[in-house]
Amino acid sequence: NLDTLMKMFADMGNNPSFSQHMNNQLQKPIPIIKRIEITLEQVYSGCMVPIEITRNIKQSGVVREETETLYVEVAKGVDTNEIIVFREKGHIVDDSPGGDIKVFVSVLDHAHFKRSGLDLIYTKQISLKDVLCGVDFEFEHVSGKLYKINNTKGQTIIYPGYKKIVPGLGLQRQEHVGNLLIEFEITFPEKLNTNQIDT
């Protein structure tokens, strides 16, 4: 009956040799650690990254190596130090559960963009003349598309620390989407000549 079965398992759990046997059977080998570096463009679109791993397979005291190429599925919006796990794809010791493979992600710095969570930050340097007379410029987004920003004279007052927010042009993580923040850095001249003052 149920009471008899429960007592039997309890007795097994109190038996040191049985407990040691179960621990040996269930203890997983140490994980295989891999690291991948990806670009911000890959973060934006998601990607598959191939990695080559070498696992040890120990059976009946004999150890052999096995090499395999795995493909890491990197989701959109992933960040540095996130870990992607391949469960039980690592080292194998007899009948114990296979060890894991842990892949640490590192996102490389971008030449033009920084990230803040899911937001992308683009810094644009402009002159005082651009502030007063208007400015337009193009830039290449991490999606590969070209975007044009046009701020005509008097449309928006650009001041030190001003940020233009473009909704939906940030990174995506599942149903969450960030924005693009364009930060304007104004370069002020040390002095103005007569022509500049008249202009």
Predicted features and spans:
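Post-J-domain flank of DnaJ/Hsp40 co-chaperones
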Residues: 1-64, 71, 94
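Intrinsically disordered, low-complexity linker/assembly segments
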Residues: 53-56, 64-199
